């Protein structure tokens, strides 16, 4: 089974998570980048209203992959606009793939309802999910958490 990690990061924490998954699974990785400078209020607002933003890459060919790891922060109890934009544009390309959601987020498991929002964006359920509290990324505990999670999916 060939895997790919698709990640977006605002502070760099989800990049660390994506790189840990890549290292553990020896898989490919792509970063979704938006063209806006970080602004807490605007970013939160865009997440709340479901706004689309300019991103790179706009689309991606997932034909060589069976499992897609979506790694992103959670902003204002929503998927950030850059990742939402990417997923909306690539929804058909990943519809037949297994989806795994991983996030480094401030509230950890309290953000679990966001997974339902992700499922609505994708039009399908995720097969597994992991919500890592940001403090675990700061303390380097996240690598153990990720490896245990990956061993069990």
Which residues make up each language-model segment?
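Short beta-alpha junction loops
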Residues: 103-109, 134-135
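Glycine-rich phosphate/pyrophosphate-binding loop and the adjoining helix
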Residues: 126-153
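Short, conserved loop/helix-junction motifs that constitute active-site signature segments
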Residues: 62-63, 88-96, 122-123
């Amino acid at each position: 089974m060939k895997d790919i990690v698709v990640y977006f990061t605002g502070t760099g924490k989800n990049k660390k998570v994506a790189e840990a998954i890549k290292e553990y699974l020896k898989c490919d990785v792509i970063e979704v980048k938006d063209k806006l400078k970080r602004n807490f209020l605007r970013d939160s607002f865009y997440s709340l209203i479901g706004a689309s933003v300019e991103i790179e890459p706009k689309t991606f060919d997932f034909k060589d992959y069976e499992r897609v790891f979506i790694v992103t922060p959670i902003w204002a109890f929503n998927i950030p606009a850059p990742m939402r934009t990417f997923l909306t544009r690539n929804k058909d390309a990943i519809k037949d793939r297994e989806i795994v959601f991983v996030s480094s987020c401030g509230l950890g498991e309290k953000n679990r309802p966001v997974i339902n929002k992700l499922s609505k964006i994708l039009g399908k359920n995720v097969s597994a999910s992991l919500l890592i509290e940001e403090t675990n990324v700061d303390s380097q505990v996240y690598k153990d958490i990720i490896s245990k999670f990956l061993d069990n999916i």
